[in-house]
Amino acid sequence: MKNTYPETFIKAPKKLDCFITTSEELIKEAQVLRYRVFAQEMGADLKTKSEGLDYDDVDSYCEHLIVYDNCNKKIVGYTRLLNQYQAKRLGRFYSENEFNLTEVLAMPGRFLEIGRTCVDPDYRGSAVLTTLWSALVQYAVEGGYNYLLGCASISPGPSGYAVEAVYRNIDAKNIAPASYQVKPSIPVPDSLRCQRDESGIPPLLKAYLRFGALVCGEPYWDEDFNCMDLFILLPLDQLKDRYSKHYMRGHQATNEIETAAIV
C-alpha cells in the first residue's frame, strides 16, 4: 500500500531539513541507513529479503520522517510514524509484537507510534536528533494526537548500557503508574540484567524522558535486534504549551504542517 500524502516540509535550522517523504528513492535511502545502524552496527538479525535494506510490512502503512543534510545530500536521521488508523489497517501497532497494550490502547485519545529511529553514526552528537525530535513533536501536537508510544532500546554488553543502571537513573516521575504498566511477551533473561554501576541513559531514551515520557514496566528482550526494549508512553497534553512557546515562536508562518498530511 502506497502513501498518498504530499511531501510535508518542516523548516530546520542551518543545513538540515526535516520532512515527511513519500519518495520511493528517499524511503529506500532511509532503509539503507536503518540497515547500517541496526544490522551492521547493532548486529540485528533483520528479516529482510533485500540485502543492505531494512524493510518490513510496517513500512507500507506508515509515514517516513527524515532529516536531510542539504550540504552532503544524504539522509542523516530517521523515524517512522504509525497512527491508530494505519495500525488498524496493518492489524497492529509494531509495539504489540512485544507487549500487551490492551489497557493502554483502551484509553480515550489518539495514538501515534514511532519506531526504527536512528541517526547516521557520523552525525551523533550534532543537531540531528534535536531536529528530528522537534519535527516529531510538531507533527504530533498539530495533528491532534494525545499520546506518543514506542520502544526505546537499550543495547547490552560492555559498550552498551546496563538495564538496572538505566532504571536507577530514571526519575520517579518518569515511571508509569500501575494503570499504564505493560508486560513484555519475552522478559529480559536474568543473565543480561547485569548489575554493574555504569551510569547514563541512552540518548533517545533521555530525549523522551526530558519531555515527560513514562517508562511502562519491564523491558522486552529482542533477540533479533540484540537489545532490550522499554515501552514508552508520552502524554502530549503537557507538551502543547511548551511546544507553542519553544518551537513555534517566530515560526508560525513557515513551520506549519499542511492539513492534508495529518490523518
Which ranges hold each PLM region?
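A broad, low-specificity signal for short, low-complexity segments enriched in glycine/proline
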Residues: 23-30, 38-43, 73-79, 108-111, ...
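Short amphipathic alpha-helix that is part of the acyltransferase structural core
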Residues: 3-76, 80-83
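Short, surface-exposed amphipathic charged segments that create phosphate/polyanion-binding patches used
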Residues: 36, 233-234
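Short, cationic low-complexity segments
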Residues: 250-263
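Residues that form generic nucleotide/phosphate-binding pockets
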Residues: 33, 169, 246
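Long, contiguous binding/interaction regions
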Residues: 238-240, 244-247
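Acyl-donor binding region in acyl/amide transferases
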Residues: 84-214, 219-227, 232, 239
